[in-house]
Amino acid sequence: MSSIDPYQYIIVEQQFSHKFRVKVVRAENVTKGALGDLLDTPDPYVELFIPTSPESRKRTRHIDNDINPEWNETFDFILDPNQENLLEITLMDANYVMDEKLGTTSYNVSKMLKTGQTETVPFLIGKATNVYLEMALEVCTKLDLRFSLALCDKEKLFRQARREKVTLGIKKLLDMEKPRFLPSTPQEVPVIAIVGSGGGFRAMVGFSGVMKALYESGVLDCATYIAGLSGSTWYMSTLFSHPEFPSKGPKEINAELMKSVSSNPLRLLLPQHITNYIQALWSKKANGQPVTFTDIFGMLIGETLIPARMDTKLSELHEKVNEAQCPLPLFTCLHVKPDVSELMFADWVEFSPFEIGMAKYGTFMTPDLFGSKFFMGTAVKRYEENPLHFLMGVWGSAFSILFNRVLGVKDTVGGEHYGGRA
């Protein structure tokens, strides 16, 4: 067993995509035809479209009244090298009512451009117009997703630093002054995890008492991880997002939490809160992100438990563990399918200040990329990192169970209502 490296990299098979970079340089002799040119000078722009690319459509700005425009705008497409990728180039004329198509042509990227090659190609559109594109193709060797079953580098460093804290914690807890009773090598230091169950506010309140006892008894100093689901993650979020934790212990933070939970829930429906909800949802929708009831649920949970920390993000919690001063929090939830029973399909998703991912598939990302659009391991559309209260809504699995009860969703086994027996 001593020959086994617990940090060995187990590489998961992955495919590399291609990055196709197109620079729309300029156009010459843009024309709308003899009659059209007499009536109006073109306001040209160029549209690029690759059907096989996830972010398939790009366009330049339009330039007013110019038959020899210069754009010098660069666009990136992520391509699957196993598919035939065809670039469609369309020259358009901007108008107030409806834009006019002046012409189109195509270019087979897969057949005509090699990786590592850069070309400047003139494309004839119509009978007289030339559009000049500078194109390059390269292999995306640096991916935004990490494909591995091993721990990330930051967590490895945390584990190494936490060993020393745990050793001191065990010595203090058990009052061991004789070194021979303590772990003699780093490998002998036990990895202890504290796990909280799900169950909404009931689980949150129960876990708050457990954490208070573990903190005051010194057991928390012997732990490497704290993991939770649903209501337990709500308490973990409240604890780790508190600006004075860990210098201020759970006893004081629990007193603040008690006031928050005891407050009138109708305050969440006050006009100023409703306005904030609408503005946040509208901003997210305007950025192209999906808006679901989870957003609203997360806002309600956040306003109840962490009203002064609604802008806190998961990645910011690394400050609590950057010197291994606290156990590493692991927030979990289940990935399920709406049309398949969770008994048949359910994948665990784990969240930490370092990474978010699924160990089953060996796929992880940094917290700021959660919710982004990916293609073959590359983030093709990035969004601002989700706030912590949104993730609290995601982790709130109890809400999904209650919602299924309201809808009367039946489990596939035995025909009983899911969770019908308390």
Q: What positions do the PLM features span?
A:
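C2-type phospholipid-binding modules
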Residues: 1-4, 28, 32-41, 64-72, ...
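Structural signal for hydrophobic/aromatic residues that build the beta-strand cores
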Residues: 20-24, 44-48, 60, 75-77, ...
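Short Trp-Ser/Thr-centered turn/loop motifs at beta-strand boundaries
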Residues: 55-62
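Patatin-like phospholipase A catalytic core
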Residues: 219, 242-243, 249-422
